[in-house]
Amino acid sequence: MNPGYRGRFAPSPTGPLHFGSLVGALASWLDARAHGGTWLVRIEDLDGPRTVPGAADDILAMLAHFGMTPDEPPVWQSTRDAAYTAALEQLVAAGLVYPCGCTRKEIADSLRAAHERHTTLAYPGTCRTGLHGKPARAWRLRVPDGCDAVVTFDDRWQHTQSQNLATEVGDFVLKRADGQWAYQLAVVFDDADAGITHVVRGADLLDSTARQIYLQRCLGVPTPEYLHVPVVVDANGEKLSKQTGATALERNDPLPALQAAAAHLGLANDGDLPGGTLDAFYTAATDAWARRFGPRAG
């Protein structure tokens, strides 16, 4: 075991595990095993209305059935309100966040006007200087101006990435108007708290990475290495998800789905990885992953 490597898979319990989720789980599991590291599972269940009762337990059971069991007990984000509150208070004390009273309609109108003027579509910072008589609805993190707003990072799959937070995003939400914690704060805090060193996830989250890196800097926590795998799309070119009708995985025979997931990750042509047993598949798949992303040798 390599104590210097800690990775994770972080599903949302909005339904059963489907093929798109399996690709993300397999990629993160293979990277952890190729590095001799620790693989964790975090249940991202902050969005109460979308959370399906029993889905988290079903996902964990399906992962185990497919041969992927976390090395430490799973963590549920819904139990971590006090920790997120402490992180926000740290940012408040540092003067890095501010309350925002803008409604969704006001923000949409502002972005529509900016589009018509062919200017930036980022949040315009309406409440940066005060609420102007409006009640506080959310908390936003200030992003810097000028060259300090540009966050550049090297992705292990997608190569060098860069985003100007000031012009492409604007001050972004850490706590929503409905009282829910925003994805960016919860993910950054949980990764740091768990000592995550390597994040392997779908490329649909590539756009969030610059924000997360900037927030890590604000909180004074380490930045992990990132690898964003291509997402699975349906016949219409949309990301395969529960919302687009993705079906649950076949529980009785995991190998065909695993082989297809490995093929999607470019590890082998469909069917080339050995069948027969999960152990044989995972040995071959881990070796194939290590040849591309290292460092299993030795």
Swiss-Prot record:
A molecular-function term among this protein's GO annotations: glutamate-tRNA ligase activity
Q: Which family is annotated? A: Belongs to the class-I aminoacyl-tRNA synthetase family. GluQ subfamily.
Q: Which organism is it from?
A: Burkholderia orbicola (strain MC0-3)
Domain of life of the source:
Bacteria
- NCBIfam families linked to this entry: PRK05710.1-2 (NF004313), PRK05710.1-3 (NF004314), PRK05710.1-4 (NF004315), queuosine_YadB (TIGR03838)
What GO biological process, any one, is recorded here? tRNA modification
Q: Does the keyword Hydrolase apply?
A: no
Keyword list (alphabetical) reads: Aminoacyl-tRNA synthetase, ATP-binding, Ligase, Metal-binding, Nucleotide-binding, Zinc
Q: Where is this motif: 'KMSKS' region?
A: 239-243
Q: How is the cofactor bound?
A: Binds 1 zinc ion per subunit.
Q: What class of enzyme is it?
A: ligase
Q: Name one GO cellular component term.
A: cytosol
Q: What is its EC number?
A: 6.1.1.-
**Where is the motif named 'HIGH' region mapped on this chain?**
11-21
Q: Which residues bind ATP?
A: K242
Please explain the role this protein plays, according to its UniProt record.
Catalyzes the tRNA-independent activation of glutamate in presence of ATP and the subsequent transfer of glutamate onto a tRNA(Asp). Glutamate is transferred on the 2-amino-5-(4,5-dihydroxy-2-cyclopenten-1-yl) moiety of the queuosine in the wobble position of the QUC anticodon.
The identity of this protein, by name, is Glutamyl-Q tRNA(Asp) synthetase
Q: Which cofactor does it need?
A: Zn(2+)
